[in-house]
Design a protein with these regions (language model features):
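Short, well-ordered alpha-helices that flank and scaffold nucleotide-derived cofactor binding pockets
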Residues: 19, 23, 43, 204, ...
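N-terminal Rossmann-like FAD-binding beta1-loop-alpha1 element of flavoenzymes
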Residues: 3-30, 373
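Active-site/ligand-binding neighborhood in enzyme catalytic cores
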Residues: 88-92, 99-236
């Protein structure tokens, strides 16, 4: 059978692209190396609770068109992301706001908070930050940095803040209002019943092959110039590849760096409410995990049991899941070299977090996929 597109990866980018192309009468086949669709936004039910299998995913956007788009796929609840940070048995509200400062310094007014932060910054006299530590200190002062930034960041990156480049933290949002809403976007929520159903709706009527890797499934027929399945049954005019761009090119220019995560999920039977919040960050270096997620709170659950997940950052090695691109100068230059190779491809498109080696929020993934569909039509 002949398909216009082979879509490699059934995550959000691939699913939106395949869905839109199918609506336009293009024939798409989707392959996915995992045993499930939805990529890292995959959710599954346990004890009546939707489990965010690959870490917390909270949908938020300022893009009204994208918000309207996702609301055609699922009904969203009114969840607001308001994480809490735990530091040496003290709890602080995030993002940094008046609730945080009132707890930290026993103050009440924005004027007092601003004076406290400015006083600490002035004392340090950092003119030109040379590393992440100096950058963070020059933005928020000593107390916030030591208690809420340093340990968490070092766990995330596996390196001391003095060894990390300053650009990783371009800004640290500091709000002088009593407001624990983490995001500034006007639209926010979580699809009722989880994200997997949303992606299922996108892929409705489209053939999806699970447990199928690109390397094992597809080859290029040098005579016809077309891509085909290794059994010769299917041919494809074009490929949308949402896997790792360096892997597509067999690492011929070198390996890009990623950070990975390990998740430890525990069912707590008979415990109705473990921590009272969906996300609690652990900001001291000595605690090995960065956060604990209690999944039921994403959907205001009242189940008699609860499920928690501890999140451990780790170095990435081949065979592990790559979660975050390490966008330092070295890796950015290497990605640009791969992007130059990609530009020469007539019939291969690269999309998503791994295909474009960038950290993408979900709304930006959808916008980028919709833009790619438009570009394809214009071509």
């Amino acid at each position: 059978m002949h398909y216009q597109y082979l879509v490699v990866g059934a995550g959000l980018f691939g699913a939106v692209f395949a869905s839109e192309m199918t609506k336009l009468g293009k024939n798409c086949l989707v392959i996915e190396k995992r045993n499930h669709i939805a990529g890292n936004i995959y959710t599954k039910e346990e004890k009546g609770i939707q489990i965010h299998q690959y870490g917390a995913h909270i949908f938020h956007t300022s893009d009204k068109e994208v918000w309207d788009y996702v609301n055609t796929l699922a009904e969203f609840n009114h969840y607001i992301n308001s994480p809490v940070a735990s530091y040496k048995d003290e709890l602080y509200n995030l993002p940094f706001n008046m609730n945080t400062f009132a707890k930290m310094w026993n103050i009440k007014t924005p004027k007092e908070a601003k004076e406290k932060i400015q006083e600490q910054i002035a004392r340090l006299n950092i003119i030109e930050p040379q590393n992440l530590e100096e950058q963070a200190l020059s933005l928020v002062g000593t107390d916030i940095y030591e208690k809420l930034v340093k340990g968490y960041t070092e766990k995330q990156w596996g390196r001391d803040c003095k060894e990390l480049p300053a650009f990783i933290i371009k800004r640290l949002p500091v709000r002088f209002v009593y407001d624990n809403n983490y995001f500034n976007d006007p639209y926010q929520g979580i699809p009722k019943g989880g994200y997997t159903g949303l992606v299922e709706k996108l892929l409705d009527g489209i053939t999806v092959k699970l447990n199928t890797s690109y390397e094992d499934y597809c080859r290029k027929n040098e005579q016809t110039g077309l891509f085909e399945s290794v059994d010769g049954e299917h041919t494809f005019e074009k490929i949308l590849y949402t896997g790792m761009i360096d892997e597509f090119y067999h690492y011929q220019l070198g390996e890009l760096s990623y950070r990975s995560l390990r998740f430890e999920t525990e069912v707590l039977e008979g415990e109705e409410n473990y921590q009272g919040n969906a996300v609690v960050n652990y900001t001291e270096r000595e605690v090995p995990y960065t956060r604990i997620i209690e999944h039921k709170h994403f959907e205001f659950g009242k189940q008699p049991d609860t499920v928690i997940t501890r999140e451990y950052p780790q170095d990435w090695e081949k065979g592990q899941e790559p979660y975050y691109p390490v966008n330092d100068d070295k890796n950015s230059m290497l990605y640009e070299a791969y992007a130059e190779l990609a530009k020469k491809e007539k019939n291969v498109l690269f999309g998503g977090r791994l295909g474009q080696y960038k950290y993408y929020d979900m709304d930006k993934v959808i916008r980028a996929a919709l833009n790619m569909v438009q570009e394809e039509l214009n071509n």
